[in-house]
Regions:
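Sec-dependent signal peptide cleavage junction
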Residues: 19-32
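Structural signature of tandem-repeat unit edges
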Residues: 7, 40-52, 63-76, 86-99, ...
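Bacterial N-terminal signal peptides that target proteins for export
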Residues: 1-11
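Bacterial N-terminal signal peptides
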Residues: 11-20
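Right-handed beta-helix
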Residues: 57-63
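Consensus positions within tandem repeat domains that build extended binding/scaffold surfaces
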Residues: 57, 78-81, 101-104, 124-129, ...
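Short intrinsically disordered, low-complexity coil segments enriched in acidic
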Residues: 1-3, 452, 497
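Short, exposed beta-strand/loop patches in secreted or surface proteins that constitute
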Residues: 34-40
Length: 499
């Protein structure tokens, strides 16, 4: 009898347990570090009071959780605890949490709001990265440290309380936050690392930065709606690509402290029309203002010493150019494609005009080259300058690169100097208006296609020391080989075209 009663009691206990949990579908689990929780069938996560730590990756990729309640007993959340909880929409946070760790809510794509308490002092690396519906984060004013990628690709984030005590904004911290419209950098911030705000395409106003001394590359790259930018007052250099592709920017004022513009700093700022207070700039890097289509002028200081390659390439509206006397080289493609330039005076201090330096300046009519330091005009330096009419090459020049005046279709006359020993390949290629060129007495060779398609070149005298004429040198040009001197020892079969 006693045995029968015991069996009945056990049966009733089992039945009661099954009944209690079958209706509400709770999953009760006891986990490590004394954290007990339950997830209801409706997706509510309850963590029992008394637990202090949510372990690493405890709920990673859990698709059942929709709402999480984290009680005040919890003081620590370990990294990746809620990573990939793609259906999580709401979190009620413990007010005793001091850190949101690495990957904590990464890729929680349904999370739309996060309210933190002043107890939070650190937001770790990628803590909210990829939370694409997160539109508001509050309670962050006491945060002292942000991690890399902390809010990267939070594409709908519109409100964020910028921490007032953060010294460093790390790389990619807010990259891709396309819905942010304004940002004010706190006074405590002294460093902004690479691409911190890159791709914030809705950002219109960038203020603060007055104490920022170190700028990473590309910090505001592709913030293509930014119209108001306050530059830092404590740095001497604008970093590489820091404001490139800020397409809505029309005016920028350079503070007195900045002396160097880094490579591609303003490249692709298509509507940048005016650069104010550039008097202290001494160096401009590669492509710094390339593709600034609206830029009309740039005032160089007397202390300016260095251009980079393509510094002002494709500045279509640049009408006037006063090249500083403190430089010795105009680098490759420095002013190529500046189609509004009509007149150019190269200072006597310039030693080298590098490859394609003024290529495709299609409205350049007047070019003055001063004798003195200039020794080299390199390959394609003035190629495709279709409005250029006359050129005098100074006596100091002893090197012409290939295609220097290629496709200068309005070029009529060129005076070459006596120091030249060759006419390189394609020097006057397709100069269809060219009528007069003096070939200096020291020239020994005329290169391939040097005078190709020069149909107006009716009268050309060859020097007595000429030895070599390259392929197609005079093809489609009315120059007779009958006038060749006896000194010629090598002439390509098709030098004057094919019969």
């Amino acid at each position: 009898m006693q045995k029968s009663k015991k069996i009945v009691s056990i049966f009733l206990l089992i039945t009661t347990v099954i009944f209690c949990f079958s209706g509400c579908s709770y999953i009760d689990q006891m986990k490590q570090k004394n954290v007990k929780y339950s997830i209801s069938s409706a997706g509510y996560l309850y963590i029992d009071n008394g637990g202090t730590v949510i372990p690493q990756e405890e709920f990673k990729d859990n698709t059942d959780i929709r709402v999480a309640y984290i009680p005040d007993s919890v003081t620590t959340i370990e990294k990746g605890a809620f990573e990939g909880c793609k259906n999580l929409t709401t979190v009620t946070m413990s007010n005793n949490i001091t850190e949101i760790p690495k990957n904590c809510f990464k890729d929680c794509k349904a999370l739309n709001k996060m309210e933190l308490f002043s107890s939070v002092k650190k937001i770790g690396e990628s803590a909210f990265e990829g939370c694409t519906t997160l539109n508001m984060v509050t309670g962050t004013t006491e945060v002292k440290e942000l991690g890399e990628n902390a809010f990267k690709d939070c594409t709908t984030l519109t409100k964020f309380d910028m921490p007032q005590f953060v010294g460093i904004i790390p790389e990619y911290c807010f990259s891709g936050c396309a819905a942010l419209t304004s940002i004010t950098i706190p006074d405590a911030t002294v460093q902004i690392d690479g691409y911190a705000f890159s791709g914030c395409t809705g950002l219109k106003s960038i203020k603060g930065m007055k104490n920022v001394a170190n700028l990473g590359n590309g910090i505001f790259y592709n913030c293509n709606n930014a119209t108001e930018i306050q530059l830092p007052l404590k740095t001497t250099e604008l970093s590489e690509s820091c404001f490139s592709d800020c397409k809505a920017l029309t005016t920028i004022t350079i503070p007195n402290n900045i002396t160097k513009i880094g490579a591609s700093s303003f490249a692709g700022c298509e509507n940048l029309k005016e650069v104010k207070n550039s008097k202290n700039i001494t160096s401009i890097g590669d492509s710094a203002f390339a593709r600034c289509f609206a830029l009309e002028k740039f005032d160089f200081s007397d202390n300016f010493v260095e251009f980079g390659m393509m510094s002002f390439s494709s500045c279509y509206s640049l009408k006037k150019l006063n090249i500083p006397i403190g430089i010795s080289i105009i680098p490759s493609s420095c002013f190529s494609g500046c189609v509004s330039l009509t007149s150019l005076d190269i200072p006597s201090t310039i030693q080298v005009i590098d490859k394609a330096a003024f290529k495709s300046c299609k409205n350049l009519q007047n070019l003055t080259l001063h004798s003195g330091a200039l020794t080299t005009i390199d390959k394609g330096a003035f190629a495709n300058c279709k409005s250029l009419t006359n050129v005098v090459v100074p006596h100091s020049v002893n090197v012409l690169g290939e295609g220097v005046f290629k496709e200068c279709s309005s070029l009529q006359g060129v005076m070459l100097n006596a120091n030249l020993t060759s006419i390189p390949n394609e020097t006057f290629y397709s100069c269809t208006s060219l009528t007069t060129v003096n070939i200096p007495k020291n020239v020994k060779s005329i290169g391939t296609r040097a005078f190709y398609n020069c149909p107006s070149l009716n009268n050309l005298s060859f020097p007595n020391g000429l030895e070599t004429i390259g392929s197609c040198a005079f093809e489609d040009s009315p120059v007779s080989k009958a006038a060749l001197p006896s000194s010629v020892i090598s002439i390509a079969d098709d030098a004057f075209g094919t019969d």
